[in-house]
């Protein structure tokens, strides 16, 4: 979950972060991983990351006779990976299409050759709209007065739940009569919809309770021609993308800002996306792209870069990415209407 910290005091602030790699939400290994949306951060865990990079280079080393065939791809990769933030692994052209911004704004989002690391000094202080102290006190008093009633209601609900559980058999009602089929391709039940870009529907343990026993969920995505599913990542699940119809391009960036996958995909192909890797999909110009994503968590949670930037205070974005006020407004509001994007319709509205 993205967050930022600002020291508004007169003394240096020392913060200690505890990373629980054994948490059930972590479906990777015990290596601590931290990724940044902006800036050019320094490596925080060099020992473990150097070991991983060594294995990666050894695994992807090519014979001399094949080396020239990957020359152009390596140059493009070096051009993309100019910074260490996750957005540095995405081309500025694609970011401009996704966020409906000018090319210069998209380049700044990638933080190329930014000499600043994790900590950025804010000149003149950070001005953010906050609730007044009096309002906070009133809210606290109101919440305290309601707490007693809420406790009584919770006790009554617990008693009723206990009585109902005593009457249930459990086995027949959870297994034998469980709903085991769901049409996630049904357009009428779409969770997200853009008439120009496409639609998305998710099946998890909330909509299909039997998935709780399998610890799986699924996401159906249909992108119309040139439609984009903007950059996003799974907070608590690995995922397997399977193309059903059409063709398009999939871009994947790891936590170090490296573009680990940027290729075209077509019907019948599989792509594995590890937990917390940023991924974006775009349909081709000739036909759309239809695929399903299987996730290793029955309630997989997704974060979208667009929504994160829109919820971040303007002053924070301006200082983190070195943007002007006009660029911040453009980034937060212009065309930022959801994770499904159509570049042509965005530019027309702009």
Swiss-Prot record:
Protein name (record): Legumin K
Comp. bias regions, Basic and acidic residues: 104-118, 141-150, 160-170
Record-linked InterPro entries: 11S_seedstore_CS (IPR022379), 11S_seedstore_pln (IPR006044), Cupin_1 (IPR006045), RmlC-like_jellyroll (IPR014710), RmlC_Cupin_sf (IPR011051), Seed_Storage-Functional (IPR050253)
Region named Disordered: 37-86, 102-170
Assembly information from the UniProt record: Hexamer; each subunit is composed of an acidic and a basic chain derived from a single precursor and linked by a disulfide bond.
An example molecular function term from Gene Ontology annotations: nutrient reservoir activity
Known role: This protein found in the seeds of many leguminous and non-leguminous plants is the source of sulfur-containing amino acids in seed meals.
Keywords recorded for this protein, A-Z: Disulfide bond, Seed storage protein, Storage protein
Occurrences of domain Cupin type-1 (ranges): 182-329
Provenance organism: Pisum sativum
SUPFAM superfamilies tied to this protein: RmlC-like cupins
Family: Belongs to the 11S seed storage protein (globulins) family.
